[in-house]
């Protein structure tokens, strides 16, 4: 029996970065939007699997609650919408992003955060579908781990990021499934 070598974080980042660079230019904006929509649906399904009672519970020390994940995805969705739309519509240079955990505001509800994400995504999609696919590809902005990307790479990164957090939500739902029985 052979042991599979576990990928280091650096190797994972390099693999994802290579995927983003090649696929963002190979796919049309419509195809990129479709992949984001599919990822968003997976995220919604995973989020719905977390019970209301478990929504703000941290599964294990040092991990995120479902509320924290949802707030983070909302923050990054707002960033994607502002940044990508700003480039496409105005040729505006976005600021770099530091993709880090932030705790969910105590008053934020699941419904409000989901509605905000939906609003950001719909505006982003509407602008992307009207965009010249070759416009402003020289404008790049950075992610603290994945480096500088143009708007098409950022759009595909939104898919990767959303799927990553969909898997995180699934793990939270599984870890906290006995929570309701307590």
Language model features with spans:
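Short, contiguous alpha-helical
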Residues: 2-15, 19-21, 56-98, 138-182
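Short acidic/polar alpha-helix capping motifs at helix-coil junctions
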Residues: 6-10, 16-22, 31-34, 46-47, ...
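A short, mixed-charge helix-start or loop-turn motif at secondary-structure junctions
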Residues: 22-29, 102-110, 144-151
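Short low-complexity stretches enriched in small and charged residues
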Residues: 22-29, 34-36, 79-82, 120-123
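Amphipathic, non-membrane alpha-helical segments in soluble helical-bundle scaffolds
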Residues: 26-36, 63-70, 110-117, 152-155
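Short, contiguous, helix-prone interaction/anchoring segments in small proteins
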Residues: 26-60
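Acidic/histidine-rich alpha-helical segments that form the ligand environment
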Residues: 35-40, 44, 100-138, 156-158
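Structural signal for well-ordered, non-membrane alpha-helices
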Residues: 40-48, 78-81, 85, 118-132, ...
